[in-house]
Amino acid sequence: MRNLLSVFFALPLLAADKPNILFILADDLGIKDLSCEGSAFYETPHIDSIAQSGMRFTNGYSTCQVCSPSRASIMSGQYPARIGITDWIGAATGMKWKRNDKVLPPENGSRLPAKITTVSEALKSGGYRTFFAGKWHIGGEGSGPEDHGFEVNKGGYYSGSPRGGYFAPFNNPKLNDGPNGEALPIRLARETNNFISQKNSKKPFFAFLSFYSVHGPIQTSPALWEKYRKKATASGLAKERFKNDRTLPVRQVQDCPIYGGMMESMDNAVGLVTSHLKKLGLDKNTIVIFTSDNGGVSSGDAFATACLPLRGGKGRQWEGGIRQPYYIVAPGVTKPGSTS
């Protein structure tokens, strides 16, 4: 992640005019959940297009197998141990750890330290308008997006999951409810587009679109559920869908129709934003970055996806838990279809 941010900070220096920056972060998305990375079940044409339009990094890793430490690293460019956030915020750590392990996990920080300079603060001081939408989960009141360099915050607060689910009403103190049934990823994309469309400033923008998707609870619309139910049935249901790996069963196949619908909904939201950039003629001067915070949930929680051939998934320090997609489109710098 530190190397990625080094590239990230250097890119604006390569152009006479400061480019806009759109950073898209998925939640609990395993690298094998994407069509362009080999999934034959999930459909992600808009995310695939980002990978194909720019540079695809083939050895991308997150700094942790769970969300809060990884997100803190993305914001700061520092490793979790240096920041003091080494587990998801809210997890029992230190003397609160109730298992019979001989070694206790370290005490975990509850917020991103105020003394740390974030990427949003650095860009804001460099003349950028800054915007955040979606999942935060690296601090509550006094340590939210607004306290770390973001001028606008739509939906980011202490919670690591969408308290009201993926359809309005959202029960989110930082996001006004839309019409009943409005899909959360689509709403976050629309909020991002509204920010991008603002005409009252000549400043470049830094928009951080941080989806709650595809974190649990796994939910989708009836139409998308039916689409992926038929797809799973047509492909033939696997006889051996789970295998034990140490203490937990691990999902072996990608055939969950609810998760398939969630993936498509998030991908459609990505498409709303990237197509909006093109509509406004901003795609030629906007750096687009896509990644995820940790691996897919193949064991525990909803057992929603499979990370094979990578071992493990979210919460485990094997490849499935930390291997990530990293895609960057930087007009005039990256070449379409290139890899590194």
Provide a role label for each language-model segment.
Residues 6-16:
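Hydrophobic h-region of N-terminal signal peptides that target proteins for export
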Residues 81-119, 171:
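His/Cys-centered metal/cofactor-coordination and adjacent catalytic loops
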Residues 1-4:
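Positively charged n-region of N-terminal signal peptides that target proteins for export
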Residues 26-42, 49, 58, 62, ...:
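Active-site-proximal cap/lid insertion segments
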Residues 51, 124:
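Anion (oxyanion) recognition and catalysis
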Residues 127-138:
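Short, well-structured beta-strand/strand-turn elements
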